[in-house]
UniProtKB/Swiss-Prot annotation:
Biased composition (Polar residues): 436-446
GO CC entries: cytoplasm
GO terms of molecular function: peptidyl-prolyl cis-trans isomerase activity; protein folding chaperone; ribosome binding
Name recorded for this polypeptide: Trigger factor
Gene3D superfamilies: 3.10.50.40, Trigger factor ribosome-binding domain (3.30.70.1050), Trigger factor, C-terminal domain (1.10.3120.10)
Record gene name: tig
PANTHER family to which the protein is assigned, alphabetical: TRIGGER FACTOR CHAPERONE AND PEPTIDYL-PROLYL CIS/TRANS ISOMERASE, TRIGGER FACTOR-LIKE PROTEIN TIG, CHLOROPLASTIC
Amino acid sequence: MSNSTLKVKTKSMPDSRLAVELEISAKQCKESYQQALSKLSKTANLPGFRKGKVPQAVLLQQVGAKRIQASAIEKLLEVVWPQALQQESIEPLCEPELIGGFEALLENFNPDSKLTLTLETDISPIPQLKSSKGLTVEAEKVVFDPKKIDELIEQSRKQLSTLIPVENRPAKKGDVAVVSFEGKFTDNNSPIEGGNSDSMDIELEKGQMIPGFVEGIIGMNINDEKTVECTFPKDYPQEDARNRKAKFDIKVKDLKTRELPKLDDDFAKQASDKDSLEELRKELEAKLKEDAHQRSIKNRQEALLKALVEQLEIDLPKTLIEIETRNLIEQTARNFAQQGIDVKSTFTPELINKLMDSSRPEAIENLRRQFAMQALRKEEGIEVPNKEVDKKFEEVKKELSKEKNIDFEKLKEAVLEDLLQDKVFTWLEENNTVIETLPKTKSLNGKPSTQGKTSQSKSKKTKTKVEKTTK
């Protein structure tokens, strides 16, 4: 088939969709038709004729012109679409859609006449930023809380504690109860999936089970039996259980309490590589301060990126939204698999359809963030020198030296992406204003109040001042 220049017209559509109108010459149509007819005549088996020797007139009569025309059109589409993409430098994101449908095109096809058809496809959107400088945002400053040191130490004491039997008293908060239970939904008395056990150790602390379960056990003695009424939370993972009332027949089989180790240097040696409790506290303080610092940085970055995304103008194509949505669902499935959940039985077609709808807003937000950063990098020429990438790549490789099955090509791409992101956030910090607000606290009159710090840096200048703000 000849590969003459196509007549191509393009028209931009909503959602970054492109309509491509193609005018195929009568010569190409005739060639495609003749080739389809010739190919079929060589393979057709008709009574009274040898294979490949069927006259074309007989073939048309027996097979029908429409079948040959359909083959001719299919071949034309295989040829002219890639030709149009190359000719017009179009990079499609998906397979094209034939506007009007194949049947309508077949009805209008005449091998002796030119053929005009329209194909639509999604293309990459063009992101534009209305502004990227002089923005003012608020971000919560994470403050180091000395109480966290004691909380971490208590957690460690709990982990190193010894469980000892409880005698002559009922269960109380902080105990560990060994219970058997069977649960049913109150509305139809049906058993709850996973709602029973012959023996389970339960920490009698808030948040360990659904609301009401632990509270129902507190006050029971060993061998006591009791029916406890509970209500499943509205955000419970098992969808059919959300907001439903349930009753659990519970029996306390055993009761234990924790004997905590003494808070001394011996405990510090057991809980860490430090020789004294004072050294342990200093180490925890340093880690908590660094954690607060990093979380503050993260809050600043998130606030700046959110403001940048608000300045983004983009027409996202449905193809990209669907791909990102599926990526989110696949990530959820991987997380479930890591928890030992049977993904195949859990992710039914019905659930996947629901997740496609519920995950769509997050997918759109993810794409907007990606394109906002991409647009800023392009506008401001933000790049990472190869030497810097190579240096960081070698550092990461060294850290992962004991890991197996590493895709180093993907690893290097991830390193580059991280470095680019760091440079984008550095640029945003230097060219915009971040007001850091402290967490809300109770003032003397009992009303919530906040204090804030404004830090602004542009280029190499840094300006910092402290001011009070009230939200």
